[in-house]
A protein has these predicted regions:
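Conserved glycine-rich beta-strand-loop-beta hairpin in the small C-terminal domain of fold type I
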Residues: 388-395, 414-418, 440-441
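Conserved small/polar residues in nucleotide/adenosyl-binding loops
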Residues: 449-456
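Short, well-ordered beta-strand elements within core beta-sheets of diverse protein domains
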Residues: 68-74, 314-315, 393-402, 417-422
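A structured beta-alpha segment of the ubiquitous adenosine-cofactor-binding alpha/beta core
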Residues: 158, 227-245
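N-terminal Rossmann-like NAD(P)+-binding subdomain of aldehyde/semialdehyde dehydrogenases
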Residues: 1-160
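ALDH superfamily catalytic-core signature
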Residues: 90-95, 174-175, 181-192, 211-219, ...
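Conserved small-residue-rich beta-alpha loop and adjacent elements
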Residues: 133, 137-216, 220, 248, ...
Length: 459
């Protein structure tokens, strides 16, 4: 007979990984109550506590998304197009947006009082414009639902490979309001979405749901639950959602350790996962780089802090005397346009190319406020992949390398292997870079800003 876990005691030994045990702490034992759930990460022994009320919220929300998916197959593409149009229209409406902005201002106020980063939390006019543009893009994207992408013909019969939705896609995002445009993109390919947003942005998220999202869903005729927000500030709501087998795909974006933990929850539940926990784009310059183009790429890749903002720049030694000044000028201009000072991290190899003007102290904007720091600091080679979570002061790492081949090796060893770009006018050099780099997004003369949901939405 199955028995329920009713309580935990301090010192209790919980098996994991086949031959290991985790020990229940006094804190966990005192907080765990009858009806709660315990998830044991089989690779690390982490004990994750899900209170009963949080589990219920997640269960019911995923159920809505799952049921909506079952209904979505009978909804025509015009209704989905209408949803994107209305959602964009409502975000563009100043009266509706005013209520959303009030909630966002409150979120920002609370986050700042806690010393939390607000870089991605502030719902600026630019973020609003980008959200609307993202929704317009989905509005005008042709549907691929039911399209035959391959056909094999035989005598008297044939077989077709036809695109179809996966199901309910679960997203967990950090606290940034613009994820709505990212997450809802999965509707275009016939999927539904259920997501949890970081607690810092929960007031904003609920305001968007009330004033723009739900009205667009209702008026377009999409099933209730096609886009569902797990309305809980508890981190454990993410554990609950990613342990629900009704999800067809789990997508997590945020800090490295937290995302890895969420990924483990989904994987041991049997849910396919797409994870991105550490960001930062890498850029490589060589003697074949056009200096003006190189400067432009650096400058435009520091217009905001997102997961694929320029984070680490590698310049070959033979090109350093030309490209490092261009790099520093672009970094200065990117900071100046924001009314801030830039922060630079360098390896020992880059030190000879840094002028004295960059070696003083400046005011750097941090989550806790302005802090006076040395503008240029030397770091170890093992630290060049650290993602700098900057506020308003652009922050990057500069490495001078012996060759492009060394830059490729460093990128494959220390980067998050997410976005890599090179500026070169030599086709053979770029081909070697492309072949050697292990990253899903690789470019020449650009850094790739991509939607979090772009790949998943193809479903």
């Amino acid at each position: 007979m199955d028995k329920k876990l009713e309580s935990l005691t301090a010192g209790m030994r919980i098996p994991y990984g086949g031959n290991n045990v985790a020990i229940v702490s006094e804190k966990l034992a005192s907080e765990f109550e009858s009806g709660d759930r315990l998830i044991v990460i089989q690779t690390t022994g982490d004990l994750l506590h899900i209170p009963a009320d949080v589990w219920d919220i997640s269960f019911k929300t995923v159920e809505q998304a799952h049921n909506a998916f079952l209904e979505l197959g009978s909804v025509d593409d015009d209704s989905i197009t209408k949803f994107f149009k209305l959602f964009a229209d409502y975000l563009s409406d100043d009266e509706r947006f005013s209520a959303i902005k009030d909630s966002n201002d409150e979120d920002v106020k609370i986050a700042r009082s806690k010393g939390r980063s607000t870089t991605r939390l502030i719902l600026s006019e630019k973020m609003r414009t980008d959200m609307v543009a993202g929704l317009r893009l989905w509005e005008n994207t042709p549907s691929q639902r039911g399209s035959a992408i391959e056909e094999i013909n035989h005598d008297g019969w044939n077989v077709k490979l036809i695109t179809a939705g996966l199901g309910a896609v679960g997203f967990i995002f950090e606290g940034r309001p613009n994820v709505f445009a990212d997450a809802t993109g999965v509707l275009r390919s016939g999927n539904t979405v259920v997501f949890r947003i970081g607690s810092d942005a929960l007031l904003t998220a609920n305001a968007i749901v009330e004033h723009a999202l739900n009205p667009a869903l209702e008026e377009s005729g999409l099933p209730i639950g096609s886009v569902s927000l797990i309305n809980s500030a508890e981190r454990s709501a993410g554990y609950a959602m990613f342990s629900d087998q009704r999800l067809a795909l789990a997508v997590a974006r945020g800090s490295g350790p937290a995302v890895a933990q969420l990924g483990s929850v989904a994987k041991q539940t049997g849910i396919p996962v797409s994870l991105h926990g550490t960001g930062g784009a890498w850029l490589v310059g060589s003697s074949n780089s056009d200096p003006g183009m190189f400067k432009a790429v650096v400058y435009h890749s520091l217009d905001r802090k997102v997961c694929n903002t320029l984070n680490t720049c590698c310049i070959t030694k033979e090109a350093a005397s030309v490209l490092v000044p261009e790099f520093l000028a672009a970094l200065s201009e990117a900071a100046e346009v924001r009314g801030a000072n830039a922060k630079l991290h360098i390896t020992e190899s880059a030190d000879p190319f840094i002028p004295n003007a960059w070696r003083g102290t400046v005011s750097i904007e941090r989550a806790e406020g302005e802090v006076v720091e040395t503008q240029t600091e030397e770091i170890k080679i093992e630290e060049i992949g650290v993602e700098w979570e900057w506020e308003n002061s652009p922050e990057v790492t500069l490495v001078v390398v012996e060759s492009v081949a060394q830059a490729i090796t460093l990128c494959n060893s220390y980067s998050p292997q997410f976005v890599a770009s090179m500026v070169t006018e030599d086709d053979a050099e770029f081909e070697a870079f492309f072949d050697g780099i292990n990253a899903p997004f690789v470019g020449n003369g650009c850094l790739l800003y991509t939607s979090d949901a772009a790949d998943e939405s193809r479903g």
